[in-house]
Every structure is written in structure tokens, then in C-alpha cells.
Amino acid sequence: MLLVGVIEWRQRKVRKEGVSMRTDAEIMQIIDEAIQSIWKTEIKHDYDENWIMNEDGLKTALYFHLRKRLAPVFAEHNLRIFTEFKDAEFSESGFRPDMVIARIDMNSDAEYWRGAVTDCLAVLELKFKSRFLDKEAIYADYEKLRAYTERLDLSCRLYMATIWECEDDPTTWIRKNAAWAKGKVTELNASLTWGERKSQFYVHVH
């Protein structure tokens, strides 16, 4: 009974003070596995059922499923999801990622929670395009990711979630041997199969 009491006390202390029982690398691995799984299952299902019809729909679906899947991890480690994020490492960069999973200091005196962010654990850019010529807009977001790796001090993984409603083979948007993306970028891709035009959701890890 004493041991159980000690464990429960430590768990309460973790939630209150943000004392982590996992390393950042372990937390980011959990987040990474969840993001990849959600993309290939829940997001594909939502798209096929016509719940995702534009970029805002994609954003809200990702937010919902991440909250649902990772709720215990978020609570234990004081993690929150921010959209159109422009604080912490991004405050003076001129960039505003579509979505960020970040840790907050629960004891911060900041007026707003965005000011209480201590570090980012995942950064996501999103794109939903329907025309073949929209490829250039997708490539532009990859250039943003490249700028993040070159100009910002980020230790987390970067994700590019793209739904491109055109027929295509499962492929990557950036070269597989691109040095700037190696070990940093994960592509969450979706397109349509040739002929049948069925959705295909897949992941490429650089």
C-alpha cells in the first residue's frame, strides 16, 4: 500500500509541476508514432467520408484526433496544441506554422499561455490542394520547412501534411537524399490513385 501511495503521489507531482518521467526524445517518439498513425487511419477515414474538404477541415481534424489520441501524454507533460503559432522560437522569425505541439510552464507569470511555451515538440505545416498546378504552393511550404531548419534552433521533428487531389504514384515532394531534411522532416502525403481515383495516404520519413 505504501508503494502504491508513493507512485500516486509522484504522478500527482508530475502533473502539477511538469516533472517529466519521460525524456523529450521519448515524448517526441510517442507524438511521432501518433501523428503517422492518425494520418494513415483517422485522417484518411475522415477524408473518404467527406469530413475534410479544405485546409481548415484538415487542421481541425488533426487537432481533434491528436487531442483524443494523446490526451494522457498531453496532461502528464503539460503539452498543448497551438495553431498559427508565432511565439517561442518563431516570435521574431516572421514565420507562423499551421500547428505546433509545445510544452508550457504551468507556473509561468505570462499573461497568455502562448507566452508560457518553453519548447516545441512537433511543428506541422498543412496543405490541401485540388489542382495539378497547385504543386507550386505545396513546394513553397517545403521551402518554409527548409528555412526552419536553417534559421531556427529547433530540436523537434517537422511535418508536412499534404492532401493533393490529383492522380499520382506514392512519392515524395523533396529529394530523398536532401541533406536539410535528413533526420528532421516527415512527409504526410495523400493523393489519388490512377484511374479509380481512390485516396491513398502514406508517410515518408527523411
Language-model region placement:
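Active-site metal-binding core of divalent-cation-utilizing nuclease and nuclease-like domains
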Residues: A75-A116
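Active-site-adjacent loop/helix micro-motif of nuclease/hydrolase catalytic cores
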Residues: G94, S108-E111, R131-E143
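Domain-level recognition of nuclease-like catalytic cores that cleave nucleotide substrates
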Residues: E150-H206
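Charged, often low-complexity linker/regulatory segments
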Residues: L2, I7, R15-K68
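A domain-level signal for the structural core that forms small-molecule/cofactor-binding pockets
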Residues: A122, Y142, T162
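Conserved catalytic cores of phosphodiester-cleaving nucleases, focusing on short active-site segments
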Residues: M99-I101, D119-S130, L145
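Short acidic, S/G/P-rich loop/turn micro-motifs used as interaction or catalytic elements
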Residues: K129-D134, E167-P170
